[in-house]
UniProtKB/Swiss-Prot annotation:
Its main location: membrane. Pfam families: Cytochrom_C_asm (PF01578). Coiled coil: none annotated. Keywords: Cytochrome c-type biogenesis, Membrane, Thylakoid, Transmembrane, Transmembrane helix. The gene is ccsA. It comes from Prochlorococcus marinus (strain AS9601). GO terms for cellular component: plasma membrane-derived thylakoid membrane. GO terms for biological process: cytochrome complex assembly. GO terms for molecular function: heme binding. The chain crosses the membrane at residues 18-38, 48-68, 73-93, 102-122, 148-168, 216-236, 250-267, 279-299. Required during biogenesis of c-type cytochromes (cytochrome c6 and cytochrome f) at the step of heme attachment. Belongs to the CcmF/CycK/Ccl1/NrfE/CcsA family. This is Cytochrome c biogenesis protein CcsA. It is found in: Cellular thylakoid membrane. It is a multi-pass membrane protein.
């Protein structure tokens, strides 16, 4: 009977059912990831569930796309799931570079909270798909909004990795040798082997996480830059103005300046250690305000609507 109802709902309400499945799989994944931290060993089960979550969100968004007829990122419900899709993808890519149990243990709670907010906090009318106004029926919707959302995901991953660096070193001095260019470190080889005159520097756990944080933020910054440029071009085509300084545009520009300052200090000043990690961690709040803050105001072209009311 339960299975019959499940499959019946899956047929008639696939978006909602898949959204709930994502929530429950993340809920299962959370204690497993925390247990892996205490065991100090990466968990293949966590990675498999994360892959499943990513695939379920992909399927959910494809269903919504098929039902609505437009790219599924036009309201807050869709964008929250798209953001979660981006964070899970970023988590898997980071783990591919460096497997450490702390990586999923910091990413999964954010993914779970994001999905829980979409499932249980958003009013029902903000979950429904609606027809787009003529100005939004453009290929720029896919280019601009998806790139900006992926930039948020990458910046959030970078901030969370910096938080993990601070957490690991909370009771001791933080010394980082990781490369600010994100390409690793090398030194001259003492043995001068025939085929190679350099050998890699072995980075510590914190240094690996710091480098991955830097790389994630760099990717997020590039994507945010592309998102701002594409948004300006789209705005000029649709409304005849490149920039209108509405709340979302203003905060997006503030976010861009924030991360530009971080990258400038890392690259030109060789800034290492606790200070850049603190700054990158603070970036999480900047992205949060940029993404959700405008919806508490309920104004501007970029607002998805008033959340509580």
């Amino acid at each position: 009977m339960i299975l019959d109802n499940f499959f019946k709902n899956l047929i008639y309400e696939p978006v909602s059912v898949l959204g709930l499945l994502v929530f429950y799989f993340l809920l299962i994944n959370l204690p497993i990831s925390l247990g892996a931290v205490f065991k100090k060993k990466s968990s293949s089960a966590v990675r498999l569930i994360t892959i499943l979550v990513n695939l379920l969100i992909t399927l959910q968004l494809l269903f919504r796309w098929s039902i609505s007829g437009h790219f599924p990122i036009s309201n807050l419900y869709e964008s929250l799931y798209f953001l979660t899709w981006g964070i899970t993808l970023g988590q898997l890519l980071v783990e591919r570079e460096y497997q450490a149990p702390i990586i999923p243990s910091i990413a999964i709670p954010i993914e779970l909270l994001t999905v829980a907010f979409a499932c249980f906090v958003l009013p029902e009318d903000l979950k429904l798909s609606s027809n787009l106004v003529p100005a939004l029926r453009s290929s720029w919707l896919v280019m601009h909004v998806s790139v900006v959302m992926l930039s948020y995901a990458a910046l959030i991953i970078g901030s969370l990795l910096s938080m993990s660096v601070l957490f690991i070193n909370k009771n001791k001095p933080l010394q980082i040798r990781s490369s600010s260019t994100g390409i690793g470190g090398f030194k001259l080889s003492n043995s001068y082997p025939v085929n190679d005159l350099v050998e890699p520097i072995e980075f510590s756990h914190s240094e690996e996480l710091d480098t991955l944080s830097y790389r994630s933020i760099l990717v997020g910054f590039v994507l945010l830059t592309l998102g701002l440029i594409s948004g300006a071009v789209w705005a000029n085509e649709a409304w005849g103005t490149w920039w209108s300084w509405d709340p979302k545009e203003t905060w997006a520009f503030i976010s861009w300046l924030f991360y530009a300052a971080y990258l400038h200090m890392r690259i030109s000043k060789g800034w290492q250690g606790r200070k850049p990690a603190l700054l990158a961690s603070t970036g999480f709040l900047v992205v949060l305000v940029c993404y959700l803050g405008v919806n508490f105001l309920g104004i501007g072209l970029h607002s998805y609507g008033w959340i509580f009311g």
